[in-house]
Protein backbone atom coordinates (compact mmCIF):
# COMPACT_ATOMS: atom_id res chain seq x y z
CA UNK A 1 0.00 0.00 0.00
CA UNK A 2 0.92 3.66 0.00
CA UNK A 3 0.40 6.60 2.30
CA UNK A 4 -3.00 8.32 2.12
CA UNK A 5 -4.64 11.26 3.82
CA UNK A 6 -7.84 10.91 5.83
CA UNK A 7 -9.59 12.89 3.10
CA UNK A 8 -8.48 10.32 0.52
CA UNK A 9 -9.65 7.45 2.72
CA UNK A 10 -13.02 9.08 3.41
CA UNK A 11 -13.58 9.71 -0.30
CA UNK A 12 -12.74 6.10 -1.15
CA UNK A 13 -14.92 4.67 1.62
CA UNK A 14 -17.89 6.87 0.71
CA UNK A 15 -17.62 5.91 -2.96
CA UNK A 16 -17.47 2.23 -2.04
CA UNK A 17 -20.52 2.56 0.22
CA UNK A 18 -22.52 4.30 -2.47
CA UNK A 19 -21.50 1.64 -4.99
CA UNK A 20 -22.57 -1.13 -2.61
CA UNK A 21 -25.90 0.63 -2.00
CA UNK A 22 -26.57 0.97 -5.72
CA UNK A 23 -25.77 -2.69 -6.38
CA UNK A 24 -27.37 -4.08 -3.21
CA UNK A 25 -24.00 -5.31 -2.02
CA UNK A 26 -23.28 -6.17 1.60
CA UNK A 27 -21.40 -3.81 3.91
CA UNK A 28 -19.81 -5.04 7.14
CA UNK A 29 -18.77 -2.84 10.05
CA UNK A 30 -16.42 -4.78 12.34
CA UNK A 31 -15.87 -3.52 15.90
CA UNK A 32 -15.09 -4.85 19.33
CA UNK A 33 -17.72 -4.68 22.08
CA UNK A 34 -18.05 -1.05 23.13
CA UNK A 35 -19.69 0.82 26.00
CA UNK A 36 -20.35 3.88 23.88
CA UNK A 37 -23.91 5.09 23.22
CA UNK A 38 -22.59 7.75 20.84
CA UNK A 39 -20.82 5.12 18.72
CA UNK A 40 -23.99 3.00 18.71
CA UNK A 41 -25.90 6.00 17.36
CA UNK A 42 -23.32 6.51 14.60
CA UNK A 43 -23.49 2.86 13.55
CA UNK A 44 -27.31 2.98 13.58
CA UNK A 45 -27.17 6.09 11.40
CA UNK A 46 -24.82 4.35 8.95
CA UNK A 47 -27.09 1.30 8.84
CA UNK A 48 -30.12 3.49 8.17
CA UNK A 49 -28.38 5.15 5.23
CA UNK A 50 -26.94 1.91 3.87
CA UNK A 51 -29.56 -0.79 4.68
CA UNK A 52 -27.37 -3.74 3.66
CA UNK A 53 -24.90 -2.88 6.43
CA UNK A 54 -24.26 -5.52 9.08
CA UNK A 55 -22.56 -4.68 12.38
CA UNK A 56 -20.30 -7.55 13.45
CA UNK A 57 -18.82 -7.52 16.96
CA UNK A 58 -15.64 -9.49 17.65
CA UNK A 59 -13.51 -9.39 20.80
CA UNK A 60 -10.00 -10.79 20.97
CA UNK A 61 -10.73 -11.03 24.70
CA UNK A 62 -14.38 -11.94 25.25
CA UNK A 63 -16.68 -9.51 27.07
CA UNK A 64 -19.51 -12.08 27.21
CA UNK A 65 -19.46 -12.41 31.01
CA UNK A 66 -19.76 -8.64 31.47
CA UNK A 67 -22.62 -8.62 28.94
CA UNK A 68 -24.34 -11.56 30.67
CA UNK A 69 -24.07 -9.90 34.08
CA UNK A 70 -25.47 -6.59 32.87
CA UNK A 71 -28.34 -8.35 31.12
CA UNK A 72 -29.14 -10.37 34.25
CA UNK A 73 -29.43 -7.20 36.34
CA UNK A 74 -30.86 -4.67 33.89
CA UNK A 75 -32.52 -6.78 31.21
CA UNK A 76 -30.44 -5.30 28.40
CA UNK A 77 -27.44 -6.98 26.80
CA UNK A 78 -24.93 -4.16 26.99
CA UNK A 79 -21.77 -3.05 28.73
CA UNK A 80 -21.87 -0.69 31.68
CA UNK A 81 -20.63 2.80 30.93
CA UNK A 82 -18.51 4.84 33.32
CA UNK A 83 -17.69 8.53 33.71
CA UNK A 84 -14.55 8.63 35.82
CA UNK A 85 -14.65 12.43 36.00
CA UNK A 86 -17.44 11.96 38.58
CA UNK A 87 -15.41 9.63 40.82
CA UNK A 88 -13.30 10.61 43.83
CA UNK A 89 -12.24 7.01 44.48
CA UNK A 90 -11.70 4.45 41.71
CA UNK A 91 -11.01 0.80 42.50
CA UNK A 92 -10.18 -1.30 39.47
CA UNK A 93 -9.97 -5.07 39.81
CA UNK A 94 -8.25 -6.46 36.73
CA UNK A 95 -9.60 -3.78 34.38
CA UNK A 96 -7.14 -1.81 32.26
CA UNK A 97 -9.65 1.00 31.71
CA UNK A 98 -6.93 3.28 30.35
CA UNK A 99 -6.13 0.69 27.70
CA UNK A 100 -8.58 -1.12 25.44
CA UNK A 101 -10.91 -2.42 28.18
CA UNK A 102 -14.51 -2.38 26.87
CA UNK A 103 -13.37 -0.58 23.74
CA UNK A 104 -11.48 2.17 25.56
CA UNK A 105 -12.44 5.82 25.64
CA UNK A 106 -12.40 6.22 29.41
CA UNK A 107 -9.11 8.13 29.58
CA UNK A 108 -10.61 11.60 29.04
CA UNK A 109 -12.97 11.35 32.02
CA UNK A 110 -10.21 9.84 34.14
CA UNK A 111 -7.83 12.67 33.24
CA UNK A 112 -10.40 15.27 34.35
CA UNK A 113 -10.58 13.70 37.78
CA UNK A 114 -6.80 13.64 38.10
CA UNK A 115 -6.52 17.41 37.81
CA UNK A 116 -6.08 18.76 41.37
CA UNK A 117 -8.97 20.96 42.53
CA UNK A 118 -8.67 22.70 45.89
CA UNK A 119 -5.75 20.39 46.65
CA UNK A 120 -7.78 17.24 45.87
CA UNK A 121 -7.89 14.80 42.97
CA UNK A 122 -9.33 11.34 42.44
CA UNK A 123 -7.75 8.37 44.20
CA UNK A 124 -7.02 5.38 41.97
CA UNK A 125 -6.39 1.89 43.36
CA UNK A 126 -5.49 -0.82 40.86
CA UNK A 127 -5.66 -4.53 41.73
CA UNK A 128 -4.17 -6.69 38.99
CA UNK A 129 -1.83 -9.56 38.17
CA UNK A 130 0.21 -7.99 35.36
CA UNK A 131 1.25 -4.37 34.93
CA UNK A 132 -1.19 -2.43 32.77
CA UNK A 133 -1.51 1.16 31.60
CA UNK A 134 -4.09 1.77 34.33
CA UNK A 135 -1.82 0.14 36.88
CA UNK A 136 1.10 2.33 35.85
CA UNK A 137 -1.02 5.44 36.52
CA UNK A 138 -2.55 4.27 39.80
CA UNK A 139 -1.86 5.87 43.18
CA UNK A 140 -1.80 2.40 44.69
CA UNK A 141 -1.16 -0.80 42.76
CA UNK A 142 -1.87 -4.12 44.50
CA UNK A 143 -0.45 -7.17 42.68
CA UNK A 144 -2.73 -10.21 43.02
CA UNK A 145 -3.46 -13.44 41.19
CA UNK A 146 -6.83 -13.80 39.46
CA UNK A 147 -8.10 -15.96 42.34
CA UNK A 148 -6.98 -13.33 44.85
CA UNK A 149 -8.66 -10.61 42.79
CA UNK A 150 -11.97 -12.47 42.98
CA UNK A 151 -11.61 -12.72 46.76
CA UNK A 152 -10.70 -9.03 46.98
CA UNK A 153 -13.81 -8.11 45.00
CA UNK A 154 -15.98 -10.22 47.31
CA UNK A 155 -14.34 -8.62 50.35
CA UNK A 156 -15.02 -5.14 48.95
CA UNK A 157 -18.67 -6.08 48.46
CA UNK A 158 -19.17 -7.34 52.01
CA UNK A 159 -17.30 -4.35 53.43
CA UNK A 160 -19.44 -1.85 51.52
CA UNK A 161 -22.78 -3.63 51.97
CA UNK A 162 -22.53 -5.09 55.48
CA UNK A 163 -19.53 -3.41 57.08
CA UNK A 164 -17.42 -6.58 57.21
CA UNK A 165 -13.69 -6.07 57.73
CA UNK A 166 -11.42 -7.59 55.04
CA UNK A 167 -8.44 -9.51 56.40
CA UNK A 168 -6.10 -8.02 53.79
CA UNK A 169 -5.07 -4.60 55.12
CA UNK A 170 -4.74 -3.05 51.66
CA UNK A 171 -8.21 -4.22 50.65
CA UNK A 172 -9.59 -3.04 53.99
CA UNK A 173 -8.14 0.42 53.32
CA UNK A 174 -9.58 0.46 49.79
CA UNK A 175 -12.98 -0.56 51.15
CA UNK A 176 -12.91 2.25 53.72
CA UNK A 177 -12.03 4.78 51.04
CA UNK A 178 -14.92 3.55 48.89
CA UNK A 179 -17.37 3.75 51.79
CA UNK A 180 -16.16 7.22 52.75
CA UNK A 181 -16.52 8.37 49.14
CA UNK A 182 -20.11 7.05 48.99
CA UNK A 183 -21.65 8.03 45.64
CA UNK A 184 -18.28 9.41 44.53
CA UNK A 185 -16.78 5.92 44.59
CA UNK A 186 -16.78 3.42 41.74
CA UNK A 187 -15.56 -0.15 41.16
CA UNK A 188 -14.75 -1.70 37.79
CA UNK A 189 -13.55 -5.18 36.95
CA UNK A 190 -12.15 -6.92 33.92
CA UNK A 191 -12.33 -10.40 35.43
CA UNK A 192 -13.66 -12.95 32.96
CA UNK A 193 -16.22 -14.28 35.41
CA UNK A 194 -19.94 -13.51 35.43
CA UNK A 195 -20.13 -13.63 39.24
CA UNK A 196 -17.29 -11.13 39.54
CA UNK A 197 -19.08 -8.86 37.10
CA UNK A 198 -22.30 -9.17 39.11
CA UNK A 199 -20.45 -8.27 42.30
CA UNK A 200 -18.97 -5.13 40.72
CA UNK A 201 -22.45 -4.04 39.59
CA UNK A 202 -23.80 -4.71 43.09
CA UNK A 203 -21.08 -2.61 44.73
CA UNK A 204 -21.76 0.34 42.44
CA UNK A 205 -25.48 0.06 43.11
CA UNK A 206 -24.86 -0.05 46.86
CA UNK A 207 -22.67 3.05 46.61
CA UNK A 208 -25.20 4.70 44.27
CA UNK A 209 -22.13 5.58 42.24
CA UNK A 210 -22.45 8.74 40.17
CA UNK A 211 -19.71 7.48 37.85
CA UNK A 212 -21.83 4.44 36.96
CA UNK A 213 -25.03 5.06 35.02
CA UNK A 214 -26.75 1.92 33.66
CA UNK A 215 -29.08 4.01 31.52
CA UNK A 216 -26.08 5.16 29.45
CA UNK A 217 -25.30 1.59 28.37
Task: Enumerate the language-model features and the residues they cover.
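N-terminal export/assembly segments and adjacent metallocofactor-ligating motifs
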Residues: 1-163, 172
